[in-house]
From Swiss-Prot:
Keywords associated with the record: Activator, AIDS, Cell cycle, Host G2/M cell cycle arrest by virus, Host nucleus, Host-virus interaction, Modulation of host cell cycle by virus, Phosphoprotein, Transcription, Transcription regulation, Viral penetration into host nucleus, Virion, Virus entry into host cell
Function text: Stimulates gene expression driven by the HIV-2 LTR. Prevents infected cells from undergoing mitosis and proliferating, by inducing arrest or delay in the G2 phase of the cell cycle. Cell cycle arrest creates a favorable environment for maximizing viral expression and production.
Protein name, entry field: Protein Vpr
Residues bearing the modification Phosphoserine: 84
GO terms (BP aspect): symbiont entry into host cell; symbiont-mediated arrest of host cell cycle during G2/M transition; viral penetration into host nucleus
Keyword Nucleotide-binding: no
Organism of origin: Human immunodeficiency virus type 2 subtype A (isolate SBLISY) (HIV-2)
Gene Ontology cellular component annotations, sorted alphabetically: host cell; host cell nucleus; virion component
Record's subcellular location: Virion; Host nucleus
InterPro entries: RetroV_VpR/X (IPR000012)
Region of interest called Disordered, as start-end residue ranges on this chain: 1-20, 83-105
Oligomer and partners: Interacts with human UNG.
Length: 105
């Protein structure tokens, strides 16, 4: 069995990133893009600055921003955002168009 090649730190001396780091960054990009559709960019900038002052430019800061934005978007949708079905009154049952067999009534 051959051994996996050793991972070397980047040339700039920073420690190597974990495989999940890219995932966190990608999720943050996606959720920020969605948040910009629903919230004032000035509010999002202020939130990002607040989290940056608490956590710096770290993955923990990115994770915290993801958590806050997820909660804000969920609450926004539940309050009745017109772009979402979450929190909207329900329509009729889509299965009601299917006739019920006579022996099951």
């Amino acid at each position: 069995m051959t051994e996996a090649p050793a991972e070397f730190p980047p040339e700039d001396g920073t420690p190597p990133r974990e495989p999940g780091d890219e995932w966190v960054i990608e999720i943050l990009r996606e959720i920020k893009e969605e948040a910009l559709k629903h919230f004032d960019p000035r509010l999002l900038t202020a939130l990002g600055y607040y989290i940056y002052t608490r956590h710096g430019d770290t993955l923990e800061g990115a994770r915290e921003l993801i958590r806050v934005l997820q909660r804000a978007l969920f609450t926004h949708f539940r309050a009745g955002c017109g772009h979402s079905r979450i929190g909207q009154p329900r329509g009729r049952n889509p299965l009601s168009a299917i006739p019920t067999p006579r022996n099951m009534q």
